[in-house]
Amino acid sequence: MTNIIELPEVLANQIAAGEVVERPASVVKELVENAIDAKSSQITVEIEESGLKMIQVTDNGEGMSHEDLPLSLRRHATSKIKSQSDLFRIRTLGFRGEALPSVASISKITIKTATKEVTHGSLLIATGGEIETLEAISTPTGTKIKVENLFYNTPARLKYMKSLQAELAHIVDVVNRLSLAHPEVAFTLISDGRQLTQTSGTGDLRQAIAGIYGLNTTKKMLAISNADLDFEVSGYVSLPELTRANRNYMTILVNGRYIKNFLLNRAILDGYGSKLMVGRFPIVVIDIQIDPYLADVNVHPTKQEVRISKERELMALISTAISESLKEQDLIPDALENLAKSSTRHFSKPEQTQLPLQSRGLYYDPQKNDFFVKESAVSEKIPETDFYSGAVDNSVKVEKVELLPHSEEVIGPSSVKHASRPQNTFTETDHPNLDLKNRQKLSQMLTRLENEGQSVFPELDYFGQMHGTYLFAQGKDGLFIIDQHAAQERVKYEYYRDKIGEVDSSLQQLLVPYLFEFSGSDFINLQEKMALLNEVGIFLEVYGHNTFILREHPIWMKEEEIASGVYEMCDMLLLTNEVSIKTYRAELAIMMSCKRSIKANHSLDDYSARNLLLQLAQCQNPYNCPHGRPVLINFSKADMEKMFRRIQENHTSLRELGKY
């Protein structure tokens, strides 16, 4: 008796379904790709309960004949390829003949189809891969496939499913990618009777992008184009100012097929160069037309992994196309728009009134074009400069660079009349104007400063500057070279981090609400996770298609950072499934410290340079900037003697060798 048997076809299809049909979105992908291959110009996707109860795809394509219909449920039966040579010039999205049999084996499937050559169509009903009904019916040209009770006979896969909202988000993402890949097809996605996505099918990629990401996003996207003998690259990329926190908005299409490719993603980022902020990614839709002989799509059942010949040449084409397109643009953002962070609103915004709520945090002074920290009563009595570097001597006539905010700036522009306030530095925390809470904060600050004073950071004696970029100082361990930008970036980062670390849970009403647009999948995911945003004081309400409205904002989020701040918090939530004010404010501190620090080629007077080194010595970590770059390097006396060959590697003196 033999131990090896040939598996029944239904069982083999169920095994194949484990690879092909991972979730309801996989079914939508396979059925829609079949509809596209059938030369459809209109495709409607209807789902119930995120596809677990029902998925229905209707198209106006070529349809199937009565004879071909039962063959479509046979494994490896396909009309896409006929011979081995066809495998190397595939231009259709499907070709394996696995998708439909796999789907049918784990669901109840109903197919209605008709071709334009016949007067009647056909109906097929199958459950678990077994055909129950096959008969002639009257139906329009095209195909309608309904999949019901998905995974009913594979409970392990059904148990693996995430929430309905998460599965719906995957379906929306699949339809969006296919819409971008085929703008000539009009797509409609309906979930539980509600329309989520609709594209016009005009063939205009830019119009398809507007239908998915919104008109405001599309306005900030640039067309790119490049070609050689093997590849044609075209598409749209966002301006450097329009970015997201993850790569999910980067869409790469090869011959109308959405693919994932790490090297091509890197080529896109290389095209932007240093124009992108660290950790930010552009919105990109790139269409690559390639000879099928140079692309092997027969790698994985999902066909999202494609091996491309001459990949390095293609990477260079993409990078060049993006960089050349950006060169032709004025990348300086609109000053008022950048200041107000109000790119998502379609109307002029009157000045917001401030509620009489006491808070501390970062504010922006448009007259001084600088940020300042608005303090409570503590700061009005004890200036911050007393704690960090002592009072600043403004009598120096040469150009000076502000290392930390002056005491006048600390209390804000509305309090400039308080310039005569006491400048005394109290050595004790028992001050009559300090309440218990502020005494504790001040005590903690003094304790921290005392500990910082005991740091092992070397005592440095400044003596010069090179190229307006590097400071030179000497200490007992030799020569120290300090990057002045990195040094002040560290100083300002720790300053801002402390000042914005605490937040107020109060809310302030907005006179004019903000509108926030998201892609369909992000919109659905955010609805599911809205409770987490509510916990940090962000209350978004659904307002139209893929749009939220914000009617009030948390006090810890200042007026000028509402638009960017809400988007940042939403991106953080989508990326990490959690939202943290602390993380957001830390990132804000890094950004502000970089923008407000001394730049290269900026000469410092001796006083400012020495003051910067004093403040650097008081930092918790004076050795690296917030981005991780070194702040200073050291040449010991022995290193210098080696470089000038005053000593040999074996430490034998040149004098001892009789050469000095």
From Swiss-Prot:
One of its GO terms (biological process) is mismatch repair. PROSITE patterns: DNA_MISMATCH_REPAIR_1. One of its GO terms (molecular function) is ATP hydrolysis activity. The keyword Repeat does not apply. The keyword Disulfide bond does not apply. Keywords: DNA damage, DNA repair. Signal peptide: none annotated. It holds the Pfam family HATPase_c_3. InterPro entries: DNA_mismatch_repair_CS, DNA_mismatch_repair_MutL, DNA_mismatch_S5_2-like, HATPase_C_sf, MutL/Mlh/PMS, MutL/Mlh/Pms-like, MutL_C, MutL_C_dimsub. One of its GO terms (cellular component) is mismatch repair complex. PANTHER family: DNA MISMATCH REPAIR PROTEIN MLH, PMS, MUTL, DNA MISMATCH REPAIR PROTEIN MLH1. This protein is involved in the repair of mismatches in DNA. It is required for dam-dependent methyl-directed DNA mismatch repair. May act as a 'molecular matchmaker', a protein that promotes the formation of a stable complex between two or more DNA-binding proteins in an ATP-dependent manner without itself being part of a final effector complex. Belongs to the DNA mismatch repair MutL/HexB family. This is DNA mismatch repair protein MutL. It comes from Streptococcus pyogenes serotype M1.
